[in-house]
Amino acid sequence: MDYLESLDFPKVVEIVKKYALSDLGRKHLDTLKPTVNPWDELELVEELLNYFARWGEPPIKGLNDISQEVERVKSGSALEPWELLRVSVFLEGCDILKKDFEKREYSRLKETFSRLSSFRDFVEEVNRCIEQDGEISDRASPRLREIRTEKKRLSSEIKRKADDFVRTHSQILQEQMYVYRDGRYLFPVKASMRNAVRGIVHHLSSSGATVFLEPDEFVELNNRVRLLEEEERLEISRILRQLTNILLSRLNDLERNVELIARFDSLYARVKFAREFNGTVVKPSSRIRLVNARHPLIPKERVVPINLELPPNKRGFIITGPNMGGKTVTVKTVGLFTALMMSGFPLPCDEGTELKVFPKIMADIGEEQSIEQSLSTFSSHMKKIVEIVKNADSDSLVILDELGSGTDPVEGAALAVAIIEDLLEKGATIFVTTHLTPVKVFAMNHPLLLNASMEFDPETLSPTYRVLVGVPGGSHAFQIAEKLGLDKRIIENARSRLSREEMELEGLIRSLHEKISLLEEEKRKLQKEREEYMKLREKYEEDYKKLRRMKIEEFDKELRELNDYIRKVKKELDQAIHVAKTGSVDEMREAVKTIEKEKKDLEQKRIEEATEEEIKPGDHVKMEGGTSVGKVVEVKSGTALVDFGFLRLKVPVSKLKKAKKEEKEESSAVSYRPSSFRTEIDIRGMTVEEAEPVVKKFIDDLMMNGISKGYIIHGKGTGKLASGVWEILRKDKRVVSFRFGTPSEGGTGVTVVEVKV
């Protein structure tokens, strides 16, 4: 029984096949089926997806389907010139692809396609022997060149003789011309003059008035031309056979290249699909969790993302809700995504999605049921369910749509509960949809099951297609009837006919839905506030770094000035020592006086500055020669600990002076004034050429403002603009690193860049 078909697996594969380069890739995609070890395929898809994001499309020259040519080689046939050209271009493309992967950092791609064999000698031989238009070149062999040279010389001789014949026999010719037919030069002789020239008649005109004659003097020449043509044909056949034999001698290598390119084409198609559907690679996990999963058969403008998680201590979901509310799509998506992941396909969902490997995936979605149509009968359902129950075990993922429908509700519900119990006892993981109340109640009381429902908007009388976990769904019949104007008296009469338990259950479900709606609204508000908080936090972190950098630069300047002064004093001391060693007493005395005078001047200056205003904790001060204003934390033994906002320094009191009032205010303003520079640019809608100067200017602005991180919004689209931006950043030496944004930063629609500051 083909459960994959009921999950729309073949339809999704058909979508992916549209992105393949050739039939090689399309045939390979048809071979992909769920396996318990899909790691190799998934890792290759992931690496190629990363390759696309950073480098754009890999080189794909000439990677066409040459399966027919390979079969002809295997059968012993010599390939025609155009076939050899086609194979040569293919093999040249293999070489280019292999070399490209060898210089990249993707280990799985490099390892897999390192097995591509080089046919450089064959490619060179084909290029030497065959022209691009398919003609065999004179360079193909010395014998071929010799034959063609002789043939050309002989043809020239025949044409010269033919021109002479026309000129000297004009009276017997119907027209002053000759023709070349079947490798022979013939003359249109009047039938009445047939015997005027000895020769062979090859053709007669339809009117009988003209015979096409080959004069005896041309027979030998024409025979020699025909012989040369036959020799040329044989030599060309020999050359083609020789080229084909190169392929035949390396048939295993050739077939392996075809297989590897088929696999590459399949990977290429899957990556193009992922980029088109904003997909990601999901690797096998120990749990089931869908994050914004989007069914690929639903148009992008209509699809509602599915968010669903099966806790580790649960083994199944019972999903209820109104018809056409999205129940079937939800369970189908779980089964489909599991099958696709196990087959090596990327999935249209967000990061954080997790799926388990199930050796058995079984589903009952009804006969030929599609997402748009829900037609089934009880008997057809039951036939599939019987098969599923027989084969189910702990390795099984079971998808059952509208279990218990198509028959009496009471009996259907009882049967549904019994089937669910049996599947759980066998250890299967189950996803079941139903609208039967007893099944909802059963799920509420079973420790291994979770209820879920499809959200319904009572105001618009339509489903929202959002999954609500933890609460069963209602039919909403009374709400819909009341909204559409049915007499309240009739509605109350209908309610009174429900049992007390049914009324309590409906009331409980309605209350739970209302509470969940409120919680969802609160969750959205909190998420929005969190995003705003993260933006503010990042902004203030950038401001902090900028101000800290400014402070450090100021202190560096002051430190340089201090070092200059120390060097000056040291130089003068060195001079004094030199004088002491070599100079006269008068010179020594003069040097000592100079040093003592400078010492006294320096001490006096320090005393004046220190005594002018006593430095104490809490004072705002500046360093000698500096502009930064700091606050004194403590003073001990003539040294003050000064807080300059983002840096604390111990400074001699003699090197400090009190700051003026306006300097204090300015310092305060500078310390806490956030930058007004925007750390993001939006280049959506631009070409790569238009975006390049904008991106470079943005990097300039980041560095001028002392900001290390910025955001470039380019959108997702085809990925061409993103690839262009990455190429610009890769070449810019001011860029430290760049990456796609996290989901909260905008995902692959945003590039986060870090620059040197």
Curated annotation (Swiss-Prot):
The gene is mutS2. It is an enzyme of class 3 (hydrolase). Keywords: ATP-binding, DNA-binding, Endonuclease, Hydrolase, Nuclease, Nucleotide-binding, RNA-binding, rRNA-binding. Endonuclease that is involved in the suppression of homologous recombination and thus may have a key role in the control of bacterial genetic diversity. Acts as a ribosome collision sensor, splitting the ribosome into its 2 subunits. Detects stalled/collided 70S ribosomes which it binds and splits by an ATP-hydrolysis driven conformational change. Acts upstream of the ribosome quality control system (RQC), a ribosome-associated complex that mediates the extraction of incompletely synthesized nascent chains from stalled ribosomes and their subsequent degradation. Probably generates substrates for RQC. Homodimer. Binds to stalled ribosomes, contacting rRNA. It comes from Thermotoga petrophila (strain ATCC BAA-488 / DSM 13995 / JCM 10881 / RKU-1). GO terms for molecular function: ATP binding; ATP hydrolysis activity; ATP-dependent DNA damage sensor activity; endonuclease activity; mismatched DNA binding; ribosomal large subunit binding; rRNA binding. InterPro entries: DNA_mismatch_repair_MutS_C, DNA_mismatch_repair_MutS_core, DNA_mismatch_repair_MutS_sf, MSSS, MutS, MutS2, P-loop_NTPase, Smr_dom. GO terms for biological process: mismatch repair; negative regulation of DNA recombination; rescue of stalled ribosome. Belongs to the DNA mismatch repair MutS family. MutS2 subfamily. ATP binds at G321, P322, N323, M324, G325, G326, K327, T328. Residues 681-756 form the Smr domain. Its EC number is 3.1.-.-, 3.6.4.-. This is Endonuclease MutS2. HAMAP family: MutS2.
